[in-house]
């Protein structure tokens, strides 16, 4: 997952 602001 690369769409999360903390990921």
Curated annotation (Swiss-Prot):
Domain of life from the UniProt record: Eukaryota
Gene Ontology BP terms: defense response; positive regulation of smooth muscle contraction
GO cellular component: extracellular region
Tissue specificity comment: Expressed by the skin dorsal glands.
Keyword Secreted tagged: yes
Subcellular location, principal: secreted
Subcellular localization: Secreted
Modified sites of kind Valine amide: 7
Sites of Pyrrolidone carboxylic acid modification: 1
Function field: Induces contraction of intestinal smooth muscle in isolated guinea pig ileum.
Protein name (record): Peroniin-1.4
